A protein has these predicted regions:
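Acidic (Asp/Glu)-rich catalytic clusters
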Residues: 6-10, 42-43, 65-75, 98-107, ...
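Active-site groove signature of glycoside hydrolases
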Residues: 101-124
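Beta/alpha (TIM)-barrel catalytic core signal, keyed to glycine-rich beta->alpha loops juxtaposed to Asp/Glu
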Residues: 117-240
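Conserved, mostly hydrophobic/aromatic
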Residues: 14-16, 41, 49, 64, ...
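A short, structured active-site edge motif that brings together acidic residues
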Residues: 74-86, 112-115, 175
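Active-site mouth loops of central-metabolism enzymes
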Residues: 20-32, 81-92, 120-125, 154, ...
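N-terminal binding-site loop/beta-alpha segment at the start of enzyme catalytic domains
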Residues: 1-76, 135, 141
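Short, acidic/polar
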Residues: 28-41, 89-105, 154-165, 232-237
Length: 240
């Protein structure tokens, strides 16, 4: 496994995302299979696990918590996210955070993100009336969050405005980064902007949920002409 240093941590370059998990014929999460995947990942050096409130119809955190509970707490780093992008009623960060800790069966999160700060929810995240960011900054002070960051699919003006206001509080940012989104979602410009704020970048969707590993044959043939030994997935890996 390849590792990268983040502050005083040694993180696996490959993380274990749980937005998509194996399911049974009736659509439930196949927990035995998921457990085997988690065990295999840890045994082979993966130590970063990413979940979120909304993943797998709000069940990902619960299943991930059960799977990781079987391993020593200091053998993995766990990240989850506050669902500001899906709120349909008044925000209650304290209640949501308490539920997340219960579902994940932990007393702290190694990494905690504001989920998808973008044009449609940035006002919720930043409104002093709700105090969302202030609440999580306080949880970090109390040790219940070790590192606070955010994920985003925002356009550049929105991202710029958010960083101007809260960049000092954000320790890392997760963006969609692959050779397609380098231009499609302006990942290049987002990387440049985040670098100006000295904010480390986390990569999500490096192969776009597998789509960049399963290209049409015509596209695969073109890539094969340039690098016969390379798979479609390896192109995504080397350009992300």
């Amino acid at each position: 496994m390849i590792y990268r240093d983040f502050q005083d941590l040694h993180l696996s370059l490959l993380g274990f995302g749980t937005m998509r998990l194996p399911t049974t014929v009736d659509g439930a999460i196949a927990e035995d299979t998921t457990q085997a995947m988690v065990d295999y990942a840890l045994a082979h050096g993966v130590n970063y696990f990413d979940t979120a409130w909304a993943y797998m119809q709000n069940l990902s955190e619960t299943v991930v918590g059960r799977c990781l509970k079987k391993h020593p707490r200091d053998s993995f780093y766990l990240a989850t996210k506050y669902p500001g992008h899906t709120l349909t009623c008044d925000p209650d960060p304290a209640d949501t955070f308490a539920q997340q800790m219960e579902k994940c069966q932990v007393d702290y999160f190694d990494f905690y993100l504001l989920h998808n700060v973008y044009e449609n929810d940035v006002d919720i995240y930043t409104d002093p009336k709700w105090g969302i960011i202030d609440y999580f900054v306080e949880q970090k002070r109390l040790g219940r969050i070790k590192h606070l960051g955010f994920s985003t699919h925002a356009d550049l003006p929105c991202l710029t405005a958010f960083l101007e206001r809260y960049g000092k509080e954000m320790e890392f940012c997760q963006i969609q980064l692959n050779y397609l989104d380098w231009t499609l979602q302006q990942a290049k410009e987002k990387c440049e902007l985040l670098n100006r704020y000295n904010i480390p970048i986390w990569v999500m969707e490096p192969i776009r949920g597998g789509k960049l590993a399963n290209l049409p044959e015509s596209m695969t043939a073109e890539l094969r002409m340039m690098r016969p030994e390379a798979s479609a997935a390896s192109w995504a890996k080397t350009t992300a």
